[in-house]
Amino acid sequence: MSHHPDLSVSLDQLLLRKEVRVRQQGEWLKRHSLPLVSFTVNMPGAVKLNAASQTVMDAGMRAIQELCQKTGWRQVACQLLVEKTGPEAFVVIQAPSASMLKKAMMKIEREHPLGRLMDLDVIDVDGHIISRQGAQLPRRRCLLCERDAVICARSRRHSVEALLAKIEEMTHDYSCCA
C-alpha cells in the first residue's frame, strides 16, 4: 500500500474531523427526524484515504442499499464525503426502529467479507449512538488474532504494517471475487 506523505493525517486532524462529523450528524438528525447511519472505515496508520478505504466504503454502501431493497426500508437521504481523514457517509434510513437498524448494520459488519473494516454507527433521533453492547452484541474481534480488537489496539499488539498487509489482502481478495 503506497503512503503518500500529503495524505498522512495527525491525531489533531482526526479529532477535529470527528468534532465536525458530530455537528453534521446533529444537523442531519434535526433535518430528517429519522435514525442516521454514520459510516466510517476502520483504517490503521496515518494514511486514512487510500484504495483500500475506498473499496471498503464502496462495498459498504452497496451492502446498505441491498439491505434497504431486501427489507423494504427506505433510504431517505445519503451523502458521501471523501476526506483526507478517510471516506465517510451519512445515510438516513426509514426503519421500524433505530435498534433494528443497528442490528442490521452489525449484521453487515459481521457477515460482509469487508465488514470488519466498516464502522456503521447508528444514531437515534435523540442523538444517542446505539452501541454494540446496548444491542447485546459482542465487541469486535482483532483482524489478526481474533482477540478483542480494542485490547489489541490499545496495547499495540500488532504493527500497523501487519494490519495494513491484512487489509490489503482482504480488499484485494474482495475486489477479485466480487
From Swiss-Prot:
GO terms for molecular function: holo-citrate lyase synthase activity. HAMAP family: CitX (MF_00398). Belongs to the CitX family. The keyword Transferase applies. This is Probable apo-citrate lyase phosphoribosyl-dephospho-CoA transferase. Its EC number is 2.7.7.61. Transfers 2-(5''-triphosphoribosyl)-3'-dephosphocoenzyme-A on a serine residue to the apo-acyl carrier protein (gamma chain) of the citrate lyase to yield holo-acyl carrier protein. GO terms for biological process: prosthetic group biosynthetic process. It catalyses: apo-[citrate lyase ACP] + 2'-(5''-triphospho-alpha-D-ribosyl)-3'-dephospho-CoA = holo-[citrate lyase ACP] + diphosphate. InterPro entries: CitX. The keyword Nucleotidyltransferase applies. Keywords: Nucleotidyltransferase, Transferase.
